[in-house]
């Protein structure tokens, strides 16, 4: 006998409830972890790819990327760079087999202050996806939300029809500049903002709605909706499910497999907290930012300045680790070391 509709409804997981008013995205490079949670989209970053590339399950992809780098030839540096681009695309292509939507693939964080290099690298990634038979409509290119990154996003969207996901976003200034650039999606971070406040203030714990990361994303969401920006707001970097529930109703939320699992086991009732209608009532005023005013406003936010630079360094460090890993596999093995 099937359970009654009332009981079924009561037992609906927080994850299923969340999916009714927010697009759920899986934040992982481990595509075997995606099946269980049935997300719409998925996001990757250099740290996630580095972690996945060290798992036994994914060594075939690593070998394929290495073979590709060798085949293209050139200097050792060129071969490594081509192998890494290919590895990111191979992971993205496998993830796309498991989701109906889009995957985000990140441009090397070491290019975060070079607009033209970011544009070139993004176009290269899209070309590799095309070679794999994947349309650019299923890809979001992730770029750091520096001034240069935001302008690279604007150029990619306007001139090349390449959709961008602006990441490492911590300040209201970054969010406003991204909206004005007309990028497809932003990833304002939640947990890393909380981390900063816990480390740098006397307050060590917060209720979800008072969480500084939650408040930051709420303000950005309300601003975008009040002034009818089309850019999607995708909350990212969560430390607990309380933060996620406090942002229910946000356009998209990208969530790690661990927290997706917790939401799946949670049967508490979930209600939307954010809404476009409520955003209209916010007292936010529209602002315009050129480069000078962007840099000033962003610089006024100590947390955002520190977390953006820290985030770039961390992603860059993991890119270097990935390079070393591939160098070891590609060249030291050849030399019998």
From Swiss-Prot:
Keywords annotated in UniProt: Acetylation, Cytoplasm, Disease variant, Nucleus, Pentose shunt, Phosphoprotein, Schiff base, Transferase
InterPro entries (alphabetical): Aldolase_TIM (IPR013785), TAL/FSA (IPR001585), Transaldolase_1 (IPR004730), Transaldolase_AS (IPR018225)
Phosphoserine modification, residue list: 237, 256
Active site: 142
Modified residues (N6-acetyllysine): 115, 219, 269, 286, 321
Keyword Cell wall biogenesis/degradation listed: no
Record GO biological process: carbohydrate metabolic process; fructose 6-phosphate metabolic process; pentose-phosphate shunt, non-oxidative branch
GO molecular function, one term: transaldolase activity
Record carries keyword Acetylation: yes
Annotated motif Nuclear localization signal, positions: 1-10
Pathway recorded for this protein: Carbohydrate degradation; pentose phosphate pathway; D-glyceraldehyde 3-phosphate and beta-D-fructose 6-phosphate from D-ribose 5-phosphate and D-xylulose 5-phosphate (non-oxidative stage): step 2/3
E.C. designation(s): 2.2.1.2
Reactions catalysed according to its record: D-sedoheptulose 7-phosphate + D-glyceraldehyde 3-phosphate = D-erythrose 4-phosphate + beta-D-fructose 6-phosphate
Related illness: Transaldolase deficiency: An inborn error of the pentose phosphate pathway resulting in early-onset multisystem disease. Clinical features include growth retardation, dysmorphic features, cutis laxa, congenital heart disease, hepatosplenomegaly, telangiectases of the skin, pancytopenia, and bleeding tendency.
Known role: Catalyzes the rate-limiting step of the non-oxidative phase in the pentose phosphate pathway. Catalyzes the reversible conversion of sedheptulose-7-phosphate and D-glyceraldehyde 3-phosphate into erythrose-4-phosphate and beta-D-fructose 6-phosphate. Not only acts as a pentose phosphate pathway enzyme, but also affects other metabolite pathways by altering its subcellular localization between the nucleus and the cytoplasm.
Assembly with partners or alone: Homodimer. Heterodimer with isoform 2. Interacts with KPNA1 and KPNA4.
UniProt domain comment: The first 10 amino acids are essential for nuclear localization.
Family per record: Belongs to the transaldolase family. Type 1 subfamily.
Annotated protein name in UniProt: Transaldolase
Gene source species: Homo sapiens
């Amino acid at each position: 006998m099937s359970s009654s509709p009332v009981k079924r409804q009561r037992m609906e997981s927080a994850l299923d409830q969340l999916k009714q008013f927010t697009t759920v995205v899986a934040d992982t490079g481990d595509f075997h972890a995606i099946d269980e949670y049935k997300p719409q989209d998925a996001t990757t970053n250099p740290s996630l790819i580095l972690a996945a590339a060290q798992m036994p399950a994914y060594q075939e992809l690593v070998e394929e990327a290495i073979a590709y780098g060798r085949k293209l030839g050139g200097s050792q540096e060129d071969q490594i760079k081509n192998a890494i681009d290919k590895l990111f695309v191979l992971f993205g292509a496998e993830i796309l087999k498991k989701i109906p939507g889009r995957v985000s693939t990140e441009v090397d964080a070491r290019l975060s202050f070079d607009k033209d290099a970011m544009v070139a690298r993004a176009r290269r990634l899209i070309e590799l996806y095309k070679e794999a038979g994947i349309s650019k409509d299923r890809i979001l290119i992730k770029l750091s939300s520096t001034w240069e990154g935001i302008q690279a996003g604007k150029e990619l969207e306007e001139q090349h029809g390449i959709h961008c996901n602006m990441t490492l976003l911590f300040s209201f200034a970054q969010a406003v500049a991204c909206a004005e650039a007309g990028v497809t999606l932003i990833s304002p971070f939640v947990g890393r903002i909380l981390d900063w406040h816990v480390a740098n203030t006397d307050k060590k714990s917060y209720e979800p709605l008072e969480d500084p990361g939650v408040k930051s994303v709420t303000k950005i969401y309300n601003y975008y909706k009040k002034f009818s920006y089309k850019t999607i707001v995708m909350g990212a970097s969560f430390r607990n499910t309380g933060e996620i529930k406090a942002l229910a109703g946000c356009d998209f939320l990208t969530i790690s497999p661990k927290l997706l699992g917790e939401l799946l086991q949670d049967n508490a009732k979930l209600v939307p907290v954010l809404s476009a209608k409520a955003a209209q009532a916010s007292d936010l005023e529209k602002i315009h930012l050129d480069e000078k005013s962007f840099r000033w406003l962003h610089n006024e936010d100590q947390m955002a300045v520190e977390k953006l630079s820290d985030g770039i360094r961390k992603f860059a460090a993991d890119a270097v680790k990935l390079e070393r890993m591939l160098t070891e596999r590609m060249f030291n093995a050849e030399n019998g070391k």
